[in-house]
Regions:
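Cap/insert and terminal regions of metallo-dependent hydrolase folds
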Residues: 94-97, 112, 190, 194-212, ...
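Short, acidic Gly/Pro/Ser/Thr-rich loop/turn segments
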Residues: 38-41, 70, 120-122, 173-177, ...
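Metallo-beta-lactamase
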Residues: 120-200, 263, 292-302
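Divalent metal-coordination and catalytic microenvironments
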Residues: 54, 75, 92, 164, ...
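Short, Lys/Arg-enriched N-terminal segments with co-localized hydrophobic residues
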Residues: 6-24
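Active-site metal-binding motif and surrounding structural segment of the metallo-beta-lactamase
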Residues: 70-121, 230-239
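Conserved beta-strand hairpin/beta-sheet module of binuclear metal-dependent hydrolase folds
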Residues: 29-78, 195, 199-214
Length: 302
């Protein structure tokens, strides 16, 4: 059963409580949305971005950092103290997930930053006018992160942050109907496609089951969920929250993504950020009692 409460009378409170109980690694898990495309309560700000504050048995983890325009503001409004951040996980190297890294490094005391080395590469998108635009992380190396008081953990392979909390590392691209959702490029001339090998997800073994946090799922939603099921040796996934980058997806890809969510018995589904209107509408129509909203200020307790 999923009970949702959103902001009421201007109070900054938006919570989702998951009530089923299954024994797992993390006994107390709370997740707060700090950056998303929509604001969920009076006084909060929105941006095209994604950032989650994760509290796992006392461990404070920031999953992505948004563009950086709303992170500290929303943190203050939501009583999230970024200065006590233990770990930062970057799902990939795009600006709307890494832009707040400077602010976190300035406030926190040497957090561990979990990131794939390719996230520091120059990255470009193609604008509507056909002109290249830079969409990468402004921090261009692990050494630069270290110089700004951050410890760096490179995550090509699955990496455990703390008991029960993992970063997937690189995700194998096995499906023949998924792509990065681009076009994305590694050069300003737009001649070298970016395979986004840096794309990764975080998953948590909670009392309720496996909780999956996505950045944009550029590796493909199906590839990502299948990889996590492989890593946990369990097909069942309790919750999936985050961007799924299906805004330009084909009908086949959307339908097969829906089938994968059913196959993995996902009980709580929070399509957010870059999922896209068509795909989000399809997910809410197919899973009306499993879907939850994820604007800034939303809180989830598992």
């Amino acid at each position: 059963m999923c009970r949702v409460r959103y902001a009421d009378h201007g109070k900054l409170r938006a919570e989702t409580h998951i009530d089923e109980g299954v024994t797992g690694m993390i006994k107390e898990l709370g997740i707060t949305v700090l950056s998303e495309n929509r604001a969920g309560a009076r006084g909060l700000l929105a941006e095209h971005g994604w950032a989650l504050w994760v509290e796992a048995d006392g461990r404070k983890i920031l999953f992505d950092t948004g563009q950086g325009m709303v992170l500290t503001h929303n943190g203050r409004k939501l009583d999230v103290d970024l200065s006590i951040t233990d770990d930062v996980v970057l799902s990939h190297g795009h600006y709307d997930h890494t832009g707040g890294l400077d602010a976190v490094l300035a406030e926190a005391c040497r957090p561990d930053v979990y990131v794939h080395p390719a996230a520091f590469q120059a990255k470009y998108g193609k604008g509507a006018d056909g002109v290249a635009r830079s969409i990468g992380c402004h921090v261009r190396s692990a050494d630069e992160v270290r110089s700004r008081s951050g410890n760096v953990v490179l995550t090509q392979l699955p990496t455990e942050i703390v008991d029960g909390v993992w970063v997937t590392g690189e995700i194998p691209r096995r499906s023949d109907f998924e792509d990065t959702g681009g076009p994305f490029f590694l050069d300003e001339k737009l001649t070298k496609p970016d395979p986004l090998v840096d794309d990764q997800a975080m998953y948590i073994e909670s009392r309720k089951g496996t909780i999956v946090l996505l950045g944009c799922a550029h590796a493909g939603l199906v590839n990502t969920l299948d990889r996590i099921a492989e890593l946990t040796s369990r097909d069942e996934i309790h919750a999936v929250l985050g961007g799924m980058h299906l805004h330009a997806a084909s009908e086949e890809r959307i339908e097969r993504s829906v089938e994968a969510l059913e196959r993995h018995s996902v009980r709580v589904l929070g399509p957010a950020h870059c999922t896209g209107r068509q795909a989000t509408s399809r997910l809410w129509a197919r899973f009306p009692d499993r879907c939850v909203e994820c604007p800034t200020g939303s809180r989830f307790a598992f």
